[in-house]
């Protein structure tokens, strides 16, 4: 049975090799591995943490690895990123255990029999040198954002405010739930989720939205199974608030996957009218249909 780190590794490798959508692949992999709530949360944190900081992780790893990262097997490249993220950002697992787990995965995943030794050497070097390693000077690498976006932020905001924005953008986002007010009120849902052991807070400026913590696997929550809420980032929900669709409207969601904005529009329209959901990527259309 796969554990959290292997699930995260498989998701990262699929994203790189196949262009898989990280959230959709990870959810499927977590379900297939039957991870409990704690391990599902760890796999999610590891996968998204690596994706969010990949340029910075590669910057550090490239200084420690004699072989250029792009010449490594995809699974080993992502395993190094995974191990580096764990050593630099997480402190729940002792360093020696993190390295040991990475080496075990390398033996299982790599085609090259020497890969396990490489993983062991690079990660142990990172442990020895991490306190002395200087962060990169350029903001793009330090915050793992594309250069064109950093240049745009700096031009508009100045370097200091742009850096603060980049740092905030790399913060761990809260889990934001959009309440399906066609079925339940925000207050009723909050009480139901609290009874299921979820920590709930009202969103400070979005109506009918809740911050959730300690959900474990959402599919196990009765409120989720009954369609009382779905997860949607606040920024995506703002698009629907700005459009302010009314009952009876015909709405076109031209960039719809995975479907959250279309759902929010249907709720705002009180299920009266029509919503046409489109996306240019066929694999994302399947997410909407699901």
What residues fall within each predicted segment?
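S-adenosylmethionine
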Residues: 1-290
């Amino acid at each position: 049975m796969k554990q959290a780190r292997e699930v995260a590794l498989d998701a990262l490798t699929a994203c790189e090799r196949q262009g898989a959508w990280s959230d959709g692949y990870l959810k499927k992999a977590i379900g297939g591995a039957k991870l409990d709530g704690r391990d599902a949360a760890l796999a999610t944190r590891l996968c998204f943490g690596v994706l969010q900081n990949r340029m910075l992780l590669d910057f550090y790893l490239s200084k420690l690895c004699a072989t250029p990262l792009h010449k490594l097997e995809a699974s080993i490249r992502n395993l190094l990123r995974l191990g580096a993220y764990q050593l630099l950002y997480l402190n729940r697992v002792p360093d020696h255990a993190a390295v040991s787990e990475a080496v075990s995965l390398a033996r299982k995943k790599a085609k090259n029999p020497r890969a396990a030794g490489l993983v062991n050497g690079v990660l142990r070097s990172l442990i020895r040198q991490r306190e002395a390693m200087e962060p990169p000077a350029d903001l793009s690498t330090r915050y793992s954002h594309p250069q064109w976006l950093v240049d745009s932020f700096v031009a508009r905001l100045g370097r200091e405010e742009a850096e603060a924005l980049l740092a905030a953008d790399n913060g761990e986002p809260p889990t934001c739930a959009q309440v399906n007010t066609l079925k339940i009120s925000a207050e009723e849902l909050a009480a139901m989720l609290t009874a299921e052991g979820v920590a709930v807070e009202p969103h400070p400026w979005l109506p009918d939205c809740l911050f959730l913590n300690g959900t474990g696997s959402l599919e196990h929550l009765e409120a989720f199974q009954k369609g009382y809420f779905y997860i949607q980032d606040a920024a995506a929900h703002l698009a629907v608030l700005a459009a302010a669709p009314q009952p009876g409207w015909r709405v076109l969601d031209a960039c719809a996957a995975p479907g959250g904005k279309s759902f929010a529009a249907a709720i705002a329209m009180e299920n009266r009218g029509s919503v046409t959901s489109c996306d240019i990527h066929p694999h994302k259309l399947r997410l909407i249909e699901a």
